[in-house]
UniProtKB/Swiss-Prot annotation:
Natural source organism: Escherichia coli (strain K12)
The name this protein goes by in its record: Uncharacterized membrane protein YahN
GO cellular component: plasma membrane
KW Protein transport (keyword) present: no
Top-level taxonomic group: Bacteria
Family: Belongs to the Rht family.
Membrane topology: Multi-pass membrane protein
Gene this protein is translated from: yahN
Gene Ontology terms for molecular function: amino acid transmembrane transporter activity
Major location category of this protein: membrane
């Protein structure tokens, strides 16, 4: 992937718009790489409905906006170079994801078919915070923006192009999370989920738990 990016470097230097398109395009490609962000939005949409899924997705999008904004000004590099801060982010974020995975598996260990007719209600900030913490605690988000911006953008890239790239990333993130929320909160999808609710929740919870344990392990061992 990075070799392909380098092939466009000459064009990027000549035309800042190419840098914008390439930056946003590479970000969109990551949507198809399953990670904690995807599974948290999917699980929330299935268990708690469209509103909860959208709010969780918006939290993830805000995290993307924050880290991409830092990356545009080189501040994200400072975070990764400070091992103590980077390790703390991993440990705290991993602990939160582990707690969420455990609660999800435990809550869904008994049939709750009524949730299909009446989605679980909670204050909006509960779901929004869930998405935000999940994204901010994911070191891959930081490393991605650092690596991509270091290749697609340079010191000569004008401010307007940087802002366009940032806006494109934020907009793409919002559209993708809302799409996921809509798709996995459809009545047909939730009915199918209800028929295999116990197994599905445990599988998704286990996947999120694996991401959480990896974050904690990396945070502890790489200090």
């Amino acid at each position: 992937m990075m070799q392909l990016v380098h092939l466009f470097m000459d064009e990027i230097t000549m035309d800042p718009l190419h840098a914008v398109y390439l930056t946003v395009g590479l970000f969109v490609i990551t949507f198809f790489n399953p990670g904690a962000n995807l599974f948290v939005v999917v699980q929330t949409s299935l268990a708690s409905g469209r509103r909860a899924g959208v709010l969780t997705g918006l939290g993830v999008a805000l995290g993307d906006a924050f880290y991409s904004g830092l990356g545009l000004f080189g501040l994200a590099t400072l975070i990764t170079q400070c091992e103590e801060i980077f390790s703390l982010i991993r440990i705290v974020g991993g602990a939160y994801l582990l707690w969420f995975a455990w609660c999800s598996m435990r809550r869904q260990s008994t049939p709750q078919m009524s949730t299909l007719q009446q989605p679980i209600s909670a204050p909006w900030y509960v779901f929004f915070r869930r998405g935000l913490i999940t994204d901010l605690s994911n070191p891959q988000t930081v490393l991605f923006f650092i690596s991509i911006f270091s290749v697609t953008l340079n010191a000569e890239t004008p401010t307007w192009a940087r802002l366009m790239a940032w806006a494109g990333i934020v907009l793409a993130s919002i559209i993708w999370r809302v799409f996921l929320s809509q798709a996995f909160s459809l009545p047909a999808v939730r009915r199918a989920y209800g028929r295999m609710q116990r197994v599905a929740s445990r599988v998704i919870g286990a996947i999120i738990g694996v991401f959480a344990l990896r974050l904690i392990y990396e945070g502890v061992t790489q200090r």
